Amino acid sequence: MDRGQDAVIVNADSAQVYADLRVLSARPSDEEMRGVPHVLFGAWDGARACSAADWAAAARREIAAAHQRGALPILVGGTGLYIRTLLDGIAPVPEIDPQVREEVRAMPLEAAYAELEKSDPERARKLAPADAQRITRALEVMRSTGRPLAYWQQQLSGGIGNDVALAPLILLPERQWLYRRCDLRFELMWDGGALEEVEALLARDLPDSLPVMRAIGVPEIAAFLRGDLSRDAAIASGQQATRNYAKRQYTWLRHQNPGDWPRMEYDNSIDSAKIASLLRL
């Protein structure tokens, strides 16, 4: 961009895709987006779930459109499943039987994990017993298809990783500095419109199962608005959830990406010259 090349910022954050979550997802402001096209920010209504496959299909279209007009698409975000689906493709898992899905999601988490340990022990060993989303997904696939999720994941198709020139960069800030920023961010959101954002979501009476209703900050603020949590308790809970997510992202970025992807560790500032050298610009 400094050299005058047109660019397009493509969102790769699973919360920033929702129009309903401008504040709680820390979506870039109009001022921050001025002058450079930003796409897939606030592109989905909260009533419609944006799956990794949905996002990857939209991202492929935006990347192709950018290339067609000679612009550089820059993916920004830390949702690992989105990025891996775009690059590697998607597993052709058959449609899950709705009754199976309903039964699995109605199970106590402990019971679901115990069943997964018996039916797909390899997958169960890789998951934390509290990882409700991944446990229920693995179990519903096993029940509905008769095969473990790993079987389907070995048959990925549709990825663009081999068709584009990648210049990846992983930013790894000092962990305690990052956690302090997480805590501060949630407090600023609380006073900067997050309450009104959640009130508007609750007024829509959307199902709790939708991703927009499970986004960090929404359950905590909803509990405060219902009178189930005090202000301080809701803020502390939201801060803890944010730190937990940052920790999971940190682990994923360190261990799940190709080893040759450059990583930049820093304390509280970013050296743009070093970034340029890492990206081989």
Swiss-Prot record:
Site (Interaction with substrate tRNA): T79, R101
Keyword Mitochondrion in annotation: no
Alphabetically ordered keywords of this record: ATP-binding, Magnesium, Nucleotide-binding, Transferase, tRNA processing
Keyword Plastid: no
Top-rank lineage group of the source organism: Bacteria
Region (Interaction with substrate tRNA): 13-16, 133-137
EC number(s) recorded for this UniProt protein: 2.5.1.75
GO molecular function: ATP binding; tRNA dimethylallyltransferase activity
Enzyme class: transferase
Cofactor: Mg(2+)
Catalytic activity: adenosine(37) in tRNA + dimethylallyl diphosphate = N(6)-dimethylallyladenosine(37) in tRNA + diphosphate
Alphabetical GO biological process terms: tRNA modification
HAMAP family on file: IPP_trans (MF_00185)
Family to which this protein belongs: Belongs to the IPP transferase family.
UniProt subunit comment: Monomer.
Function as written in the Swiss-Prot or TrEMBL entry: Catalyzes the transfer of a dimethylallyl group onto the adenine at position 37 in tRNAs that read codons beginning with uridine, leading to the formation of N6-(dimethylallyl)adenosine (i(6)A).
Name assigned to this protein: tRNA dimethylallyltransferase
UniProt organism field: Novosphingobium aromaticivorans (strain ATCC 700278 / DSM 12444 / CCUG 56034 / CIP 105152 / NBRC 16084 / F199)
Gene transcribed to yield this protein: miaA
